[in-house]
């Protein structure tokens, strides 16, 4: 449902069935056709369990992959759509969560942030005719400590990301 303008709640959406098209579930003794958002949560939990328990990913990386796969590159949802559906609908096939398209490169960076630390990661970034011939995006996910005294977002930690090239003086030329 609707939350603060800079939050997407829910993070993602999934099929929960409707009276027009039910989903099939396994009840204790038989198959049942049901509808409702509460039936979508186990499907997302199952995908997260696969990413964490089978592939060995951290919960942060698993959540980021789920959100990233729901958002996709071609979708540009309106703020109203994000407020109602989150970042998009998670793909049905787990392969679409863990693999990227042939024209994409996905970097997964995971680290532990300590107080007031800055980190630089070097990725091979092409420069052509003094321009960057690509589109970049980041899906960041973390589970911060929270405190009601921290203001509107309640978190004790904040993350920022900047893309660019480090020049000869060691400074970042942001894109």
What name fits each language-model region?
Residues 14-16, 66, 140-142:
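Active-site proximal loops enriched in glycine and acidic residues that flank catalytic Cys/His/Asp
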Residues 65-69, 80-89:
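A glycine-rich phosphate-binding loop feature that marks nucleotide/adenosyl-phosphate handling sites
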Residues 83-167:
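Secreted peptidase-domain scaffold signal
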Residues 1-42, 57:
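Catalytic-core environment of secreted peptidases
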Residues 170-175:
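Noncatalytic accessory or regulatory domains flanking protease catalytic cores in secreted, cell-surface
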Residues 40-50:
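Active-site-proximal alpha-helical segments within enzyme catalytic domains
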Residues 55-77:
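An often Trp-containing, charged/polar helix-loop segment at the C-terminal end
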Residues 18, 72, 144-146:
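Short loop/turn segments at secondary-structure transitions that flank enzyme active sites
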């Amino acid at each position: 449902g609707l939350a603060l303008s800079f939050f997407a709640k829910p993070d993602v959406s999934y099929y929960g069935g409707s009276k027009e098209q039910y989903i099939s579930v396994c009840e204790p003794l038989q198959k049942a056709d049901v509808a409702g958002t509460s039936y979508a949560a186990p499907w997302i939990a199952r995908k997260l369990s696969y990413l964490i328990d089978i592939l060995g990913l951290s919960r942060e990386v698993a959540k980021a992959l789920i959100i990233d796969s729901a958002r996709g590159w071609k979708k540009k949802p309106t703020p109203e759509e994000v407020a109602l559906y989150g970042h998009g609908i998670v793909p049905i096939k787990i392969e679409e969560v863990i693999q990227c398209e042939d024209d994409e490169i996905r970097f997964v960076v995971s680290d532990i942030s300590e107080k007031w630390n800055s980190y630089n990661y070097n990725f091979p970034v092409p420069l052509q005719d003094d321009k960057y011939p690509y589109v970049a995006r980041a899906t960041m996910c973390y589970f911060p400590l929270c405190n009601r005294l921290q203001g509107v977002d309640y978190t004790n930690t904040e993350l920022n990301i900047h893309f660019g090239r480090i020049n000869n003086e060691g400074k970042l030329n942001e894109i």
